[in-house]
């Protein structure tokens, strides 16, 4: 568990945090440049020193301004991966990985190397590596120090699109197989969608929202970040069954289900899906003989006018689903809170 209750002033910027983060999964730190994202993880890592408050990791006090406690970075058991990999140019990859390696991680070396797909790189110098390869090595080096927490400061920011696509699957694999909590700084919605369990939104050094990805994503805090045509819902589902005759998989959403193209995941596997509001249409009665496979019973929570369109907030199986319709459709269907209807979903994307 990471307890953050501190304030810090750097130049004209003031960062104030009072949150407790669970000791598992990935928490994305999100916001514009200058919002305080890097300042936050620098304070946690010990690169800067807050003027007020405390930082406590798994019961160990890293910072306590009143008591004058400020552990040095090397005593914090916190790994840090920067935007640029910062590898030692005169060491081969193997040497970079072993630099600072904890004795407790010696037996884990081969497993971690395989997990990150860097075994073929062990005898190469950093200068011969691609940007994505360098970042995989940097992540491996940080993990081999046996940290209790891993900080990643926009690790994909300096990479081109092909290299980002190369690195994302390795980060996703890490989240599944390495039981180390991570703070992931990013201003990329795509990265957050694919990686984060939770999101903390910072603005001018203040926390605007903090919670599960699907909750924060559907909140008004994210509206400025989402172009109107990209308003969407993030939902947690589980694999329910695979169709016996067609290449389709059913995903459980409450007591209802969604059909998607066949997945390789086993039954009961947990997934996260994204549904664009523009891919959801509404009808008052169950449609007959329709080509749309996904028709869900839903209740209207509210509706909002938005530049000539209407955003309809629905509840499906205790989850929030958004639909975008025209004012004409709203009036003709008499959309109002509490109305039960059917949501027709044209497309579903798997995000994680």
Curated annotation (Swiss-Prot):
Transmembrane spans: none
InterPro entries for the chain: AAA+_ATPase, ABC_transporter-like_ATP-bd, ABC_transporter-like_CS, Mo/tungstate-bd_C_term_dom, ModC_ABC_ATP-bd, Molybdenum_import_ModC, Mop_domain, P-loop_NTPase
Ranges where the ABC transporter domain occurs: 1-229
Coiled coil: none
Keywords carried by this UniProt record: ATP-binding, Cell inner membrane, Cell membrane, Membrane, Molybdenum, Nucleotide-binding, Translocase, Transport
Membrane topology, as annotated: Peripheral membrane protein
Statement: the UniProt record of this protein carries the keyword Protease: no
Main subcellular location of this protein, as a coarse class: membrane
UniProt enzyme class: translocase
Binding, ATP: 31-38
Catalytic activity: molybdate(out) + ATP + H2O = molybdate(in) + ADP + phosphate + H(+)
GO molecular function, one term: ATP hydrolysis activity
Stretches assigned to the Mop domain: 289-352
Subcellular location: Cell inner membrane
Name of one Pfam family that matches: ABC_tran
EC identifiers of the protein: 7.3.2.5
Cellular component terms per the entry's GO annotation: plasma membrane
Record's keyword annotation contains ATP-binding: yes
Complex formation: The complex is composed of two ATP-binding proteins (ModC), two transmembrane proteins (ModB) and a solute-binding protein (ModA).
Family of this protein: Belongs to the ABC transporter superfamily. Molybdate importer (TC 3.A.1.8) family.
Role description: Part of the ABC transporter complex ModABC involved in molybdenum import. Responsible for energy coupling to the transport system.
Name of the protein in question: Molybdenum import ATP-binding protein ModC
Species: Shigella flexneri
């Amino acid at each position: 568990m990471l307890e953050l209750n501190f304030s810090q002033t750097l130049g004209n910027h003031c960062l104030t945090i009072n949150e407790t983060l669970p000791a598992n999964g990935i928490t994305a730190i999100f916001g514009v440049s200058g919002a305080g994202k890097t300042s936050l993880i620098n304070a946690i890592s010990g690169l800067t020193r807050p003027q007020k408050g405390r930082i406590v990791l798994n019961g160990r006090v890293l910072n306590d301004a009143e008591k004058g406690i400020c552990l040095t970075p090397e005593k914090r058991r916190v790994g840090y991966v920067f935007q640029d990999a910062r590898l030692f140019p005169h060491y081969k990859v193997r040497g970079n990985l072993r630099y600072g390696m904890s004795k407790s991680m010696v037996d884990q070396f081969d497993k971690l190397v395989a997990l990150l797909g860097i075994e073929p790189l062990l005898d190469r110098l950093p200068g011969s590596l691609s940007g994505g390869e360098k970042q995989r090595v940097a992540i491996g080096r940080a993990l081999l120090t046996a940290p209790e927490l891993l900080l990643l400061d926009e690790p994909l920011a300096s990479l081109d699109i092909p290299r980002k696509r190369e690195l994302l699957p390795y980060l996703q694999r890490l989240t599944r197989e390495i039981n180390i909590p991570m703070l992931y700084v990013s201003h990329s919605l795509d990265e957050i969608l694919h990686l984060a369990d939770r999101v903390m939104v910072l603005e001018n050094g203040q926390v605007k929202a903090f919670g599960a990805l699907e909750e924060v994503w559907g909140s008004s805090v994210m509206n400025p970040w989402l172009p109107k045509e990209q308003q969407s819902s993030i939902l947690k589902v589980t694999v329910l069954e695979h169709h016996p005759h067609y290449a389709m998989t059913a995903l459980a959403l409450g007591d209802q289900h969604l059909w998607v193209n066949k997945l390789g995941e086993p039954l009961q596997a947990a997934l996260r899906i994204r549904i664009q509001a523009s891919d959801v249409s509404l009808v008052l009665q169950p449609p007959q003989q329709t080509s749309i496979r996904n028709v869900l019973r839903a209740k209207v929570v509210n509706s909002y006018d938005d530049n000539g369109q209407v955003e309809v907030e629905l509840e499906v199986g205790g989850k929030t689903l958004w639909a975008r319709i025209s004012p004409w459709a709203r009036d003709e269907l008499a959309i109002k809170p509490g109305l039960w209807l059917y949501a027709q979903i044209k497309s579903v994307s798997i995000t994680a």
